[in-house]
Each structure stands twice: as structure tokens, then as C-alpha cells.
């Protein structure tokens, strides 16, 4: 496994080369350097996965945890130090495959999508940095190393979301993403420091006897760490940055939503899962409730959005909620006794990465063809874009949980885990799954059917044009991801990844599976009835019948306005303003008085320096007399 270090080195070298010398290169060469390096990373990731899982299990029946590279970076005490290295276990190996695959498809796709864009070389440099950061995060040997790459992921996302730096919206979106996640990451950092202090290590597997002494501080540390994960994974109410992140290039959205930034929080909880189960089960259950509410909220908002990318953004938030719920409903490390959700969450992370990347890249082809994000400017595109149409349909069926596509298998395992934990949670998540099928096929019909194409004129004034299929560099990733989406559900995932590391054979709960399929088909039928027609009479009727609800959902239930009120009216006015007054009128005046008194004293002392030697002698004798009296007394 010595070659695993190249998985990090190759994209880093690509970033350095393109960042330092990219502007001297032609676009094709810059793109080729980034893409070839990612192709190498992908091949190495596949080789690592094959060697790891083909190597077999240990005598205890679990896959081993390998550390091909590890060195001490910063020592603090005998036990407490920060290491840097590479750790391979089932979930880190799986994430290597997911990240490298999606990133490679994004690199290939960007050849066509970003053609002619200013800053092409800079774009590929940032893509390489983004990919390297996430790869480093998932192979981290300890929580502090994870935090280092965690922050690199945040910086990379800031650079890519704000790629179009001449657009005010892109600048605002990148700042918003950076600031919101920084607030969350503060909780993550405090949690890491508390954990390191009481556990006497930054390792993912501390000594049990040390944790027993730490008591309630470990649950506190884990809860604070989850705040960081909630910010990265856009959990309510820290989700507000993700929809605005759509201002970046569409391929970047695919990478952020499918394989990098937003799944980092899920990976964090999965990585710390043994500690959550052993020392903070109540925190884990609260995580489930937060995930369930987030999934419902995001699904509700997605039903009313008109921007194709924002529908997919809220879809991502909802699906991340599913993964978080699956982890939160676990009550045991044994998959047969309450630990099924761990495997289900990782399974859904894998399948979701493929079909969500497919959806975003398909959306990019559509935007590339019609030059608009608004669904009202689309319709009837199935005639003009057959490859995009069929691959997009496959992704919609997968995310809706229709057999035999991959989303059916992973979502069914999540629902089974939820019903094992609580029938109430199970039915809530089933209802959210139905909403998912509805808003995804609302999106599908508004884009590809819904009458004839409305037409669009180029900004250059060339007049209306007919939409066209994207070039092969853009459609090949669609076909590749669609193929994976069709077959990924049949991977024996439980044999590779489970909560306790032992092989687990997935058994479909036929009652739950049948119920979820029936409800999904009913939701698709409802979307067909409402949106497949040319004039959408039912949809328009409902929007006018419930205008306040529709408007509230369209405006994301005014969460942006609420956050603006909290920050501007409460934090800035009620907290920052008094603090600023105290700083100016108390702190500043204190130091001003100190400076004035020092200056006044100096003036008085200066007057004593008259140049008269006799006067100096008198002062000297007086001082000596005073010192003598003090010593005698």
C-alpha cells in the first residue's frame, strides 16, 4: 500500500504546476494536466480498494486498519501529539473511490463546460486543490489531521464558489459559505481541543480507561464536533450557504454536493461512530432528530423552487439528512442489533454521490444548451437532448427509490433502520422519500416535457436558437455515472462495510420495500398529473390556492431573513454595539488616562531637572535620608 501516498501527491503537484505556471499554458494543456493527474489518482484508488478488500479479513472476521504512512508532526506531551499520515479502513477506502471517481468525471466534463472561460487554468488548479483536500481528510490518521484538511476543503470551496469573481452574487456566495462554515468550525475546533485534553490523544481510538475518567466531557466534545459537521453538511439551521453556492460553475456544484464538502460532516460522524455509540448515544439520537427535520425542511423548499440548480441543492440537503438520520438511529455496533444505520448511511453516501453528480452534470448540459437556470425557460428538451434526457431520468428514478436503481437499495436500508429505531421516525422518513420523488419528477417534467421548448436568445443578439446535445466530453461522464447508478445497488455493500466491521448480508424488508416503492410511484404519478401537461393547470391552481405556503417555501421559509435579523439586529446591535461602546468609552479611556498620567508625571519630573548642581545634591541627600529611615524602621 506504499503507493497510497501518490493519491495525495498527484493532485497537489497538479495544483502547484497549474497555480504557478498555468497562465503560461494553453487551456487544453492545463486541463490535460489536471485530468491526467486525477486519472492517475483514480486508478491508484481503485488499486488500493482492490488490494485492501481482496486482502481478506483478519482472524477476528474484520478488515484490518492499515497505516502505511505515519509520522509525529507536533509533540505536546508524552501521550499527546499530532501525527500526519495515511490510514486505510473500509470507509476511508470507499471514500477514496467515491471522491476520485466523481472528481475525474468533473475534470473531463469541465473540458466542454468551461471551454472559452476566462481563468480556465485557475479553475483546474482549484479543482486539484479541492480534490487533494478531501482525499487528505478521509485518510487522516487522527482528528487534528482531519481538521487541517477540513479547513483546506473550506478554503478550496471558497475559491471555487467565487470563481466568477467579477459577479457580485458569486463574491457574496463565497463569503457566505466561508463565514457560515467558519462559525461551525469554531465548535469543531473547541470540541477537538476538549477531546484531546481529556482523552490525552487526538487518535480516533483512544484508550478506554482514559475516556472512563473523562466522564461527561467526551459527549460535550463530540457534540461540538458535530456542530462543525453540521456546518459542512448544511444541516438546519446552518444550511443557508449551500443554495447560494450555486453561483459557482455547475461542475463545481457537482463536486461539492456529490463527493466532497457536504459529505464531510457525514464522514466525521461515521469516523467517530464508536465513540458516539459508547459515550454519547443521546447526542447521536439528537443528531437523528436534526437530520430528520433538515430532510423534511429541505424537501419542502425543493417543491417550490424554480431554479434547476437550487432544486438540486435542497435535494442534497435532504439526502444528507437521510444519511445523518441513519447514523443517528443506531443503538449498537452490531448491525443485527441496532447498527444497521451505519452501513445504510455509508451505502447511501456511495450511491448518492453517483446519481447526484449525474444530476448536476446533467443540469450543466441543460444550462449550457438553453443559457438559463430557470425551469420556466425550458420544456420539451427530450427531443433535442436525448443522452441528457435518459441519463437525467435514470438519476431521478434512483433518487426516488425506484427498483432496480441504486437509490432504492440504499434508501430502503435507511428506512429499515429507522423503523427498527422508531416507527414514527420510519414513517416520517418514508413521507420525505415520497416528497423526494415528487419534486424530482416535477423538475424532470418541467425540463424535458411540459409542452414545447420556450426558446431563448443569445446575449450576443444572434437570436433564438435550437437547443443541442452537449459535446462528448460532457455526455461521457453522464453515461459513465448513469451506468454506475444502474448497477451500484447490487454491490454486496454489507460484506464490505458495517458498523462493527464484520460481514453483514443485506436482506430487504419486503414490506418496507413494497411500501416505499408504492409511495414513490404514487408521488411520481402526482407529479405527472400536475406538471406533465402543457399548461400545468393543477400546479398553478395549488400555487394560487395556497399562496402564502407556496411563497414561504419559495423563499426558503425566510431563513436567510431570520439569520440576517439575528446577526444584524441581535448580534451586531444588541451585542456588538454595547461591546463597541465599552471598548471606546471604558477600555480606550482607561488607556488614554494611563498615557495622560504618564505624560503629566514626566512633565513634573522634567521640571526637577533644573541644571543646578546644588539642587541635585539636596534631592540626593533627601532621598538617601528617606531610604535610611525606611531601613531603620
Question: PLM ranges: what are they?
Answer:
Residues 27-41, 173-185, 382-391, 468-482, ...:
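Alpha-helical transmembrane segments and their helix-start/interface "positive-inside/aromatic belt" motifs
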Residues 1-9, 25-32, 80-98, 136-149, ...:
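Membrane-entry segments of alpha-helical transmembrane domains in multi-pass membrane proteins
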Residues 77-81, 87, 494-511, 532-633:
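Aromatic-capped, Gly/Pro-kinked transmembrane alpha-helices
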Amino acid at each position: 500500500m506504499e503507493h497510497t501516498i501518490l493519491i495525495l501527491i498527484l493532485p497537489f503537484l497538479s495544483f502547484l504546476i497549474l497555480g504557478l505556471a498555468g497562465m503560461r499554458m494553453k487551456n487544453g494543456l492545463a486541463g490535460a494536466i489536471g485530468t491526467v493527474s486525477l486519472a492517475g489518482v483514480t486508478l491508484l484508488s481503485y488499486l488500493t480498494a482492490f488490494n485492501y478488500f481482496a486482502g481478506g479479513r483478519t482472524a477476528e472476521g474484520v478488515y484490518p486498519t492499515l497505516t502505511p504512512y505515519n509520522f509525529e508532526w507536533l509533540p505536546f506531551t508524552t501521550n499527546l501529539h499530532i501525527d500526519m499520515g495515511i490510514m486505510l479502513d473500509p470507509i476511508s477506502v470507499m471514500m477514496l473511490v467515491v471522491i476520485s471517481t466523481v472528481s475525474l468525471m468533473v475534470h473531463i466534463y469541465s473540458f466542454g463546460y468551461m471551454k472559452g472561460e476566462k481563468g480556465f487554468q485557475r479553475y483546474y488548479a482549484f479543482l486539484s486543490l479541492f480534490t487533494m483536500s478531501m482525499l487528505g481528510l478521509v485518510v487522516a490518521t487522527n482528528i487534528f489531521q482531519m481538521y487541517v484538511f477540513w479547513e483546506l476543503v473550506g478554503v478550496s470551496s471558497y475559491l471555487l464558489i467565487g470563481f466568477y469573481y467579477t459577479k457580485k452574487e458569486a463574491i457574496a456566495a463565497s463569503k457566505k459559505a466561508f463565514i457560515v462554515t467558519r462559525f461551525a468550525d469554531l465548535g469543531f475546533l473547541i470540541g477537538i481541543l476538549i477531546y484531546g485534553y481529556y482523552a490525552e490523544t487526538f487518535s480516533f481510538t483512544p484508550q478506554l480507561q482514559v475516556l472512563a475518567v473523562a466522564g461527561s466531557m467526551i459527549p460535550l466534545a463530540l457534540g461540538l464536533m458535530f456542530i462543525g459537521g453540521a456546518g459542512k453538511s448544511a444541516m438546519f439551521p446552518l444550511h443557508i450557504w449551500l443554495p447560494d453556492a450555486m453561483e459557482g460553475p455547475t461542475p463545481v456544484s457537482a463536486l461539492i454536493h456529490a463527493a466532497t464538502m457536504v459529505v464531510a460532516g457525514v464522514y466525521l460522524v461515521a469516523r467517530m461512530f464508536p465513540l458516539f455509540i459508547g459515550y454519547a448515544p443521546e447526542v447521536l439520537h439528537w443528531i437523528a432528530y436534526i437530520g430528520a427535520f433538515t430532510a423534511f425542511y429541505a424537501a419542502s423548499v425543493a417543491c417550490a423552487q424554480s431554479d434547476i440548480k437550487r432544486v438540486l441543492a435542497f435535494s442534497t440537503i435532504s439526502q444528507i439528512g437521510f444519511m445523518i438520520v441513519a447514523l443517528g438511529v443506531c443503538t449498537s455496533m452490531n448491525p443485527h442489533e441496532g447498527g444497521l444505520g451505519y452501513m445504510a448511511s455509508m451505502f447511501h453516501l456511495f450511491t448518492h454521490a453517483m446519481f447526484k453528480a449525474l444530476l448536476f452534470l446533467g443540469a450543466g448540459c441543460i444550462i449550457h444548451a438553453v443559457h438559463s437556470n430557470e425551469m420556466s425557460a425550458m420544456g420539451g428538451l427530450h427531443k433535442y437532448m436525448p443522452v441528457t434526457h435518459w441519463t437525467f431520468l435514470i438519476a431521478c428514478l434512483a433518487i426516488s427509490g425506484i427498483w432496480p436503481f441504486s437509490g432504492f437499495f440504499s434508501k430502503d436500508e435507511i428506512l429499515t433502520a429507522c423503523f427498527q429505531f422508531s416507527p414514527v421516525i420510519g414513517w416520517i422518513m418514508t413521507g420525505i422519500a415520497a416528497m423526494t420523488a415528487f419534486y424530482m419528477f416535477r423538475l424532470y417534467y418541467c425540463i424535458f416535457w411540459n409542452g414545447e421548448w420556450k426558446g431563448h436568445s443569445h446575449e450576443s443578439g444572434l437570436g433564438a436558437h435550437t437547443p443541442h446535445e452537449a459535446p462528448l466530453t460532457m455526455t461521457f461522464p453522464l453515461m459513465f455515472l448513469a451506468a454506475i447508478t444502474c448497477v451500484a445497488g447490487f454491490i454486496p455493500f454489507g460484506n464490505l462495510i458495517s458498523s462493527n466491521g464484520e460481514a453483514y448480508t443485506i436482506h430487504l424488508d419486503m414490506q418496507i420495500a413494497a411500501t416505499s416503492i408504492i409511495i414513490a410511484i404514487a408521488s411520481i404519478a402526482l407529479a405527472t398529473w400536475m406538471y406533465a401537461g402543457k399548461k400545468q393547470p393543477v400546479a398553478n391552481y395549488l400555487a394560487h390556492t395556497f399562496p402564502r405556503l407556496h411563497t414561504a417555501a419559495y423563499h426558503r421559509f425566510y431563513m436567510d431573513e431570520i439569520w440576517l435579523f439575528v446577526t444584524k439586529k441581535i448580534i451586531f446591535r444588541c451585542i456588538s454595539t454595547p461591546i463597541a461602546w465599552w471598548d471606546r468609552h471604558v477600555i480606550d479611556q482607561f488607556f488614554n488616562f494611563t498615557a495622560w498620567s504618564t505624560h503629566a508625571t514626566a512633565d513634573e519630573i522634567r521640571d526637577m531637572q533644573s541644571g543646578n548642581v546644588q539642587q541635585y545634591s539636596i534631592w540626593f541627600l533627601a532621598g538617601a535620608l528617606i531610604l535610611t529611615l525606611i531601613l531603620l524602621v
